[in-house]
Curated annotation (Swiss-Prot):
<keyword id="KW-0418">Kinase</keyword>
<keyword id="KW-0963">Cytoplasm</keyword>
<dbReference type="Pfam" id="PF01202">
    <property type="entry name" value="SKI"/>
</dbReference>
<dbReference type="InterPro" id="IPR000623">
    <property type="entry name" value="Shikimate_kinase/TSH1"/>
</dbReference>
<keyword id="KW-0808">Transferase</keyword>
<keyword id="KW-0067">ATP-binding</keyword>
<keyword id="KW-0028">Amino-acid biosynthesis</keyword>
<dbReference type="GO" id="GO:0009073">
    <property type="term" value="P:aromatic amino acid family biosynthetic process"/>
</dbReference>
<feature type="binding site">
    <location>
        <position position="139"/>
    </location>
    <ligand>
        <name>substrate</name>
    </ligand>
</feature>
<dbReference type="InterPro" id="IPR023000">
    <property type="entry name" value="Shikimate_kinase_CS"/>
</dbReference>
<feature type="binding site">
    <location>
        <position position="32"/>
    </location>
    <ligand>
        <name>Mg(2+)</name>
    </ligand>
</feature>
<dbReference type="GO" id="GO:0009423">
    <property type="term" value="P:chorismate biosynthetic process"/>
</dbReference>
<dbReference type="InterPro" id="IPR031322">
    <property type="entry name" value="Shikimate/glucono_kinase"/>
</dbReference>
<feature type="binding site">
    <location>
        <begin position="12"/>
        <end position="17"/>
    </location>
    <ligand>
        <name>ATP</name>
    </ligand>
</feature>
<dbReference type="InterPro" id="IPR027417">
    <property type="entry name" value="P-loop_NTPase"/>
</dbReference>
<comment type="pathway">
    <text>Metabolic intermediate biosynthesis; chorismate biosynthesis; chorismate from D-erythrose 4-phosphate and phosphoenolpyruvate: step 5/7.</text>
</comment>
<protein>
    <recommendedName>
        <fullName>Shikimate kinase 2</fullName>
        <ecNumber>2.7.1.71</ecNumber>
    </recommendedName>
</protein>
């Protein structure tokens, strides 16, 4: 199997951590679309949102998603990449999509422990747990819709990677 593997889920679900470990296990390249966008635009997410608004950020996110998609690549997408029906169709058409699911409580705890997440602008202006609950409520169906596989992102990264490898191996056998 050489197709792109897309990791989707909310902020803090483990897309980058698990994506890096998965890429290493497969001998694939790893790309985080948020980091790619920051490097190519020379702006942080907060700066893009401040200067171009969330619509501008989402447009850049879509362009980054398409730019990094390549064989033998694991892509950690931004949490909101699924908001675009074009992005959802693109990911399903160009690879395997894995949704890392986690509860609002787990996500809030992880985000509170990550100093980089403090730099990220709020989507709603609400406290973090409330915002996560709102975001999950609005995106859960989209994550489910786009995903070929749904996994529990609260497990250890090594266990999740092992589960993904087993699923991918099972797909090759079929």
């Amino acid at each position: 199997m050489t197709q792109t593997i897309f990791m989707v889920g909310a902020r803090g679900a483990g897309k980058t951590t698990i994506g890096k470990a998965l890429a290493q296990a497969l001998g694939y390249r790893f790309v985080d679309t948020d980091l790619f966008m920051q490097q190519t635009s020379q702006m942080t997410v907060a700066e893009v949102v401040e200067s171009e608004g969330w619509d501008g950020f989402r447009l850049r996110e879509s362009m980054a998603l398409q730019a990094v998609t390549a064989p033998k690549t694991v892509v950690a997408t931004g949490g909101g990449a699924v908001l675009s029906s074009e992005n959802r169709a693109f990911m399903r058409d160009h690879g395997r999509v894995i949704y890392l699911r986690a509860s609002a409580a787990v996500l809030a705890k992880r985000l509170a422990e990550d100093p980089e997440e403090a730099q990220r602008p709020s989507l709603t202006g609400k406290p973090i747990v409330e915002e996560i609950l709102d975001v999950l409520a609005s995106r859960e169906a989209l994550y489910q819709d786009v995903a070929h596989h749904v996994l529990d992102g609260t497990q250890t990264p090594s266990l999740v990677v092992e589960q993904i490898l087993q699923m991918l191996t099972g797909e090759m056998v079929k």
